[in-house]
């Protein structure tokens, strides 16, 4: 009996550790995503019943059940110290406090908007379909593409090397 209790306690610890493993890739549809630098990984969803949250292929996605009307409809607070990828549709990104990362990819579509303060070695940004993004901070390399009446404001971003800054008219 003692061995079974120890086994179950160990199994519970392993499952809890795996569940709290920090996620580094995010997708949002219809949400305001607020990223806050923190050594402790934590996520708070304003009203979890409004949407679905799913982890698949190392991407944590937040998708509203009702995609009609004005967006965003709910807010997600993400406390983390490491982000690799943020993808958004009909959403808003808020990261006013600086994040220090090696590489970051941000993709905005369908009228998404936001502000990102970052210190990165490599920063890839893609904005499409009327999206607006303000970048602050610094990066060694910036790879930026805009399409379909979108804009990326880099006035407050110090860039050492701009590998691509292209605008495609569609």
Q: Would you name each region that the model predicts?
A:
Residues 1-109, 113-128, 132-170:
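Intrinsically disordered, low-complexity terminal regions
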């Amino acid at each position: 009996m003692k061995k079974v209790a120890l086994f179950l306690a160990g199994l519970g610890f392993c499952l809890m550790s795996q569940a709290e493993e920090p996620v580094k890739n995010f997708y949002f549809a219809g949400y305001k995503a607020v990223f806050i630098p923190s050594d402790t990984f934590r996520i708070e969803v304003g009203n979890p019943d409004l949407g679905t949250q799913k982890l698949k292929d190392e991407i944590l996605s937040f998708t509203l059940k009702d995609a009609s009307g004005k967006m965003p409809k709910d807010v997600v607070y993400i406390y983390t110290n490491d982000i690799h990828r943020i993808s958004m549709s009909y959403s808003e990104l808020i990261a006013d406090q600086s994040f220090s990362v090696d590489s970051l990819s941000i993709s905005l579509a369908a009228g998404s908007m936001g502000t990102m303060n970052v210190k990165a070695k490599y920063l890839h940004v893609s904005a499409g379909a009327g999206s607006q993004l303000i970048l602050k901070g610094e990066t060694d390399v910036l790879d930026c593409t805009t399409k379909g009446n979108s804009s990326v404001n880099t006035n407050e971003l110090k860039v050492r090397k701009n590998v691509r800054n292209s605008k495609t008219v569609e």
